[in-house]
């Protein structure tokens, strides 16, 4: 019998606020899968890497935004039909003005703010965004 274990993926929920209200940080992807699509920042956990460290590493790699692993709280865990296990980590709300400015990275066109739930490039990201805007991750 062969076993296939799920591949763990971390996804960052970084709430921010400004004069227009509260929003979530999202990215526009420049790599497959979902090139050109809008998604939450995230990616694979490296071998023997703590999931909170992976989450803040991916957030910084894709947005330039820094955060502390100790500030990450597990908001949700969802299994994707393609064999991935997504761990959604919630970070504390921050002022948008204090974030690194949006700039292209190796994997994204930079970051933007999502001000209301909308369909994202990955269905589970869409579900998590909807849950966050409905207040289910508070």
What is the meaning of each model-derived region?
Residues 1-39:
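N-terminal strand-loop-strand
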């Amino acid at each position: 019998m062969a076993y296939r274990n799920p591949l763990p993926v971390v996804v960052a929920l970084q709430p921010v606020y400004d004069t227009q209200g509260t929003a979530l940080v999202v990215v526009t992807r420049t790599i497959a899968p979902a090139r050109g699509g809008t998604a939450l920042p995230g990616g694979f956990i490296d071998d023997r890497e703590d999931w909170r460290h992976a989450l803040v590493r991916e957030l910084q790699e894709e947005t330039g935004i820094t955060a502390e692993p100790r500030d990450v709280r597990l908001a949700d865990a969802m299994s994707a039909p393609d064999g991935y296990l997504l761990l959604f980590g919630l970070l504390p709300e921050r002022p948008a003005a204090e974030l690194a400015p949006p700039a292209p990275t190796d994997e994204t066109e930079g970051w933007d703010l999502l001000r209301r739930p909308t369909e994202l490039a990955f269905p589970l990201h869409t579900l998590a965004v909807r849950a966050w805007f409905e207040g289910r991750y508070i």
